[in-house]
């Protein structure tokens, strides 16, 4: 539940805060022991020992994920009830996986189109650089974003928003700083290694701000770390993984598949 974002994004040491506690109880007291049952919000609140208002956010999140559905009896004195899709956690999770893969397939097509626009470097590493082996935490948020056009800027905006690199705070996306950093620094120059200071200078921003966007691209797997081969500066720099968007996206897809496989095994154990 923590890995898919349901319990929030705070540090694990805050795991007992109200949101996480209610989220875990929702599964351990209600959904897992009674997959065949539909629940009203009042019944859930009583089982979880919280006010009704504390249940709504969790239900909305799980409905958007595709894990829960609602039954409407159609009678005023018989309120709607929420339940697991197909009355089964494994089958409900199959639907979540299908949705994730459908999103991924659409973004695959966008990435392939963009790869033809941007081209590729002659080598997987920038000249004079060595790979800097450091495993960055993989963090991706797949969401469905409708197509807005076939222009490169529109495709890149959709791709980045679909994997969580761009957010609603960045509209218009094509004019935003994270867009310009990804586009101008890394996609248009797949042969070059950039330090955080160089990215900050180019984007006319602070080093911490540049690092925030670089770290997001690292967590997506879009960028890789490198250093000077001769042992001199830079000791730490960043480049487009594999020297092309096509290669970088392939690595992202592979990691998503591994994550989905691991989640499926956990769901099977819970069932």
Task: Label every model-predicted segment.
Residues 129-147:
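Charge-rich interaction segments
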Residues 1-28, 141-183:
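Short alpha-helical segments that sit at the start of domains
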Residues 90-134, 243-271:
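Amphipathic alpha-helical dimerization/coiled-coil segments
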Residues 63-74, 218-230:
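A short, conserved structural fragment
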Residues 49-64, 204-219:
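Short amphipathic alpha-helical interaction segments
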Residues 35-47, 190-202:
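Short acidic, hydrophobic short linear motifs in intrinsically disordered regions
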Residues 31-37, 58, 186-192, 213:
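Short helix-capping/hinge SLiMs at alpha-helix to coil transitions
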Residues 19-23, 73-98, 172-178, 228-254:
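Short, cationic-aromatic polyanion-contact patches
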């Amino acid at each position: 539940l923590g890995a898919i974002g349901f319990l929030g994004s705070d540090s694990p040491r805050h795991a007992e805060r109200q949101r996480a506690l209610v989220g875990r109880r929702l599964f351990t007291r209600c959904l897992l022991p009674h997959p065949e049952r539909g629940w009203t919000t009042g019944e859930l609140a009583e089982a979880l020992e919280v006010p009704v208002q504390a249940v709504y956010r969790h239900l909305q999140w799980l409905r958007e994920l595709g894990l829960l559905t609602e039954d409407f009896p159609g009678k005023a004195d018989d309120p709607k009830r929420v339940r697991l899709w197909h009355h089964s956690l494994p089958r409900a999770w199959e639907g979540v996986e299908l949705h994730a893969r459908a999103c991924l397939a659409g973004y695959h097509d966008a990435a392939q189109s963009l790869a033809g626009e941007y081209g590729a470097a002659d080598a997987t590493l920038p000249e004079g650089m060595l790979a800097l082996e450091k495993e960055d935490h993989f963090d991706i948020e797949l969401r469905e974003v409708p197509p807005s056009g076939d222009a490169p800027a529109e495709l890149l905006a959709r791709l980045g928003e679909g994997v969580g690199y761009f957010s609603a705070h960045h509209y218009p996306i094509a004019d935003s700083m994270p867009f310009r950093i990804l586009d101008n620094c890394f996609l248009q120059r797949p042969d070059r290694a950039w330090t955080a200071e160089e990215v900050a200078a180019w984007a006319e921003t602070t080093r911490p701000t540049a690092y925030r966007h670089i770290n997001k691209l690292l967590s997506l797997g879009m960028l890789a770390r490198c250093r000077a081969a001769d042992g001199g500066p830079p000791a730490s720099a960043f480049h487009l993984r594999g020297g092309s968007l096509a290669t970088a996206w392939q690595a992202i897809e592979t990691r998503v598949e591994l994550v989905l496989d691991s989640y499926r095994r956990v769901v099977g154990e819970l069932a």
